[in-house]
């Protein structure tokens, strides 16, 4: 029992509650496995509203529950999904409430093909953003190539398949192999050099080919250096890497992607039978067009001949046209004459309505009426003016100083003819003139007294 951990901890003689047992088990696990990397496949992936991620990590024989809390889940760049192979870093712990053994993860990374797939998607997105996959930069393949360069391995079935297709379909095409490694550490550099060399040889087209394999085997065709070398080629290039289900970055950058190397050869190898059928079709189209052209020319010449042989028909047509124009001219003249006559009638009616004799009669009638109304109007005006004059005379008589003098008052004037209004304006012995209602008096001032005038109210 030397290796019994409970004996080392002295737990073989202590009775624990379930909570105590789970707590000590958790502490023991976290102490022994503070950080560990585990590789497996994701399953039972769950994302509750809290933002935490829960999943099961499994292999063919076992599984373990995992928890990835929100702050760590936000740092995971790879989209997690069931079936994804990953590497998980975390600590081994135990959920005390249920006694569940689990891995508390802080990092999740793709494993195996998953890492390669992530790199593949990243490079694909980068090159697409630069426009290397744009359709407008793709070039058409030559319809009848004479010289084709093949960038591939000199050994293996790929080059034999390509040669076989060209021998069968287009033996006249000259094929040149530009050898390169297509797998391994040196493959990327060799493929780049082979593409650059082939692009300088003046080939009509290039084939970049490799047989099938795993993702790791085909990875050199997913390297950025190879992709940029393909994009830099001035020669139209067909990418034929792997089987039909395999897709590489070079497929996206090349002008044309072929599912297999044999399919690439068929794209560039014009079939003799197809060429013969195309020539036959062109010959038939040419014959039909010549027949149509001859028929049109014959009809045109026959029409010209008919016009030349029968000038009388043309004269008859012109005479008929002249008669038609004459009739149209007569009808137009008659319509114009009717319009002018109608307009003349309207003018006569308006002129009769505005005849000077009628106007003079109306004016004379109006003048007689005014002459009859004038004496009566003059009497009314004269009467009104007389009444207004009498009213003004009465008003004037009321405010006239002569009326005041008529009531016994007088006006004193000094030697300059100025009216005396205040006793202070005179001096004793001064001579004044008193104007009465009837006549004037010469008076002399004996004395002057300035006595204020007071008014008293009668009770």
From Swiss-Prot:
Substrates-to-products reaction catalysed: Exonucleolytic cleavage in either 5'- to 3'- or 3'- to 5'-direction to yield nucleoside 5'-phosphates
EC number in record: 3.1.11.6
A cellular-component GO term for this protein: exodeoxyribonuclease VII complex
Recorded GO MF terms: exodeoxyribonuclease VII activity; nucleic acid binding
Record has Hydrolase as a keyword: yes
Cellular location(s): Cytoplasm
PANTHER family in alphabetical order: EXODEOXYRIBONUCLEASE 7 LARGE SUBUNIT
Classification via HAMAP family: Exonuc_7_L
Subunit structure of this chain's protein: Heterooligomer composed of large and small subunits.
Family named by the database record: Belongs to the XseA family.
Functional note: Bidirectionally degrades single-stranded DNA into large acid-insoluble oligonucleotides, which are then degraded further into small acid-soluble oligonucleotides.
Entry protein name: Exodeoxyribonuclease 7 large subunit
Lineage, highest ranks first: Bacteria, Pseudomonadati, Pseudomonadota, Gammaproteobacteria, Pseudomonadales
């Amino acid at each position: 029992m030397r290796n019994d951990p409970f004996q080392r901890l002295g737990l073989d003689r202590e009775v624990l509650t379930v909570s105590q047992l789970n707590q000590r088990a958790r502490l023991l696990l976290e102490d022994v496995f503070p950080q560990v990397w585990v590789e497996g496949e994701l399953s039972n992936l769950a994302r509750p509203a809290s933002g935490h991620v829960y999943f099961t990590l499994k292999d063919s024989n076992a599984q373990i529950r995992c928890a990835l809390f929100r702050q760590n889940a936000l740092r995971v760049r790879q989209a997690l999904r069931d079936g994804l192979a990953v590497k998980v870093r975390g600590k081994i712990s135990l959920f005390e409430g249920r006694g569940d053994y689990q891995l508390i993860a802080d990092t999740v990374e793709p494993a195996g093909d998953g890492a390669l797939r992530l790199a593949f998607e990243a490079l694909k997105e980068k090159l697409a953003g630069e426009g290397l996959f744009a359709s407008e930069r793709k070039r058409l393949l030559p319809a009848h190539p004479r010289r084709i360069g093949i960038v591939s391995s000199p050994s293996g079935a790929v080059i034999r398949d390509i040669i076989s297709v060209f021998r069968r379909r287009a033996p006249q095409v000259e094929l040149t192999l530009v050898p390169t490694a297509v797998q391994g550490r040196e493959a990327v550099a060799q493929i780049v050099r082979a593409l650059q060399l082939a692009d300088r040889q003046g080939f009509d087209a290039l084939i970049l080919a490799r047989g099938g394999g795993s993702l790791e085997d085909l990875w050199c065709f997913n390297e950025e250096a190879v992709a940029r070398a393909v994009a830099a080629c001035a020669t139209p290039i067909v990418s034929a890497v792997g089987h039909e289900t395999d897709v590489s970055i070079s497929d996206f950058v090349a002008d044309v992607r072929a599912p297999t190397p044999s399919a690439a050869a068929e794209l560039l190898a014009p079939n003799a039978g197809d060429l013969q059928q195309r020539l036959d079709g062109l010959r038939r189209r040419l014959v039909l067009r010549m027949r149509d052209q001859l028929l049109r020319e014959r009809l045109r010449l026959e029409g010209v001949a008919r016009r030349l042989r029968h000038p009388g028909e043309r004269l008859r047509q012109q005479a008929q046209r002249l008669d038609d124009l004459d009739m149209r001219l007569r009808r137009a003249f008659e319509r114009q004459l009717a319009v002018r006559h109608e307009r003349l009638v309207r003018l006569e009616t308006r002129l009769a309505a505005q005849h000077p004799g009628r106007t003079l009669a109306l004016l004379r009638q109006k003048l007689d009426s005014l002459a009859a109304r004038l004496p009566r109007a003059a009497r009314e005006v004269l009467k009104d003016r007389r009444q207004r004059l009498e009213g003004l005379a009465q008003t004037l008589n009321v405010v006239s100083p002569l009326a005041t003098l008529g009531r016994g008052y007088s006006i004193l004037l000094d030697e300059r003819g100025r009216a005396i209004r205040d006793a202070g304006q005179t001096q004793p012995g001064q001579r004044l003139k008193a104007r009465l209602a009837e006549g004037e008096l010469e008076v002399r001032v004996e004395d002057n007294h300035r006595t204020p005038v007071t008014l008293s109210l009668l009770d």
